[in-house]
Amino acid sequence: VYETIQDAVNATNPGGLVLVDKGIYYEEVVVRTPSITIRGIDRNNVIIDGEFEKANGIIVAGVDGVVVENITARNALLNGFYFATVEGYRASYVTAYNNGDYGIYGFDSVDGVIDHSYASGSPDAGFYIGQCYPCDTVINNVISENNGLGYSGTNSGGDLYIVSSIFRNNMGGIAPNTLDSELLPPERESFIIGNHIENNNNIKAPAWPNQYITLGNGIIIAGGNNNIIKNNVINDHNVFGVVVTAAFDDNYWPAHGNLIQDNLILNSKKADMALSGISNLGNCFKGNTFQTSFPPGIQTSGECGDNIFSRGSDLSGLWSSIARIVYVNQGSFEVGDWRTMPVPPLQQNMPSANSFFMNIFPAVNVFDKYKIDYTNIKLPETAEKYLN
């Protein structure tokens, strides 16, 4: 028995288990041993609290194969759970709330699984996967609310799946994007399938300036290429349900080859679907159920081909984004304080988590081993009422 999680982690050999009893642990856990599993016996009552002083709840940097399960991290200055420069990682049944940057954060890391998890109160994003190609990562069955963004993915993609999840009441919803500030641009080949993306208009959410720019949009593909947005329910956004737009940083990044297919998009105040920017080539909208588009006639009646060029793009959305950036840079926006966001409701525990004899599987080839049928993704139950 150890007094701190850190002491137990330091004493554990590769392949071992750290089973954490109920309690509030005022520490930052730094993992330096590969292939260990850190598991709480009660997701809602095993809490790592950063006291608004420590950088992260749990940080796994340069150490492969680590698994974190059934734990809550709150009140860190930066991130709840942070995986950086690793090959093989998994976070299951974890809760991250009221952390100063991201909730669950994977950066420069591949072969990952994040599932059955929850994030709120993050001024950047509840969930983030950045700077990886191919990422070989899946985010499945998560809830992200009251964040700057529900999901952000800068310069990531390649077998990157975001499925069967709920993104609601954030400032902006899901934002695959390209920036010059990270390696491996552009963002590409992300699969956003079977999610419920709802009411991301939350002006009271915490947010940085870049997140404020996304306010009122469900899915924003900003300078991304060859993404597939399919079979989602996207409703009640004050600007766009889905918008495909160029991104501008040090360089100008057009959006190419994105497929927006078979989504149900409802009650968007400006337009359900939009295409904006210059030289956006080969973007395809087909089979979607919607009412309005910007510009009109954005959806083709048949199969999309190479003849779908920038003729359908509208520059007014781009100018609107530029105007909002100017507004933000003048400091003319108010957001919520991540330190005082609401405490989330109790979340589902991992089955049999309090058993020391539960199987231990280090995060090795976790993406390939993850048993999910990507051709038959189920929507969250919250979306069902919109399908009838």
Where in this protein do the model-derived segments appear?
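Solvent-exposed coil/turn segments that connect beta secondary-structure elements
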Residues: 23, 34, 41-43, 53, ...
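Right-handed parallel beta-helix/beta-spiral solenoid domain characteristic of secreted/periplasmic
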Residues: 1-3, 17, 22, 35-77
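Extracellular beta-rich repeat passengers
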Residues: 53, 93, 194, 207-214, ...
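Acidic, glycine- and Ser/Thr-rich low-complexity intrinsically disordered tracts
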Residues: 253, 268-388
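Right-handed parallel beta-helix/beta-solenoid
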Residues: 1-7, 11
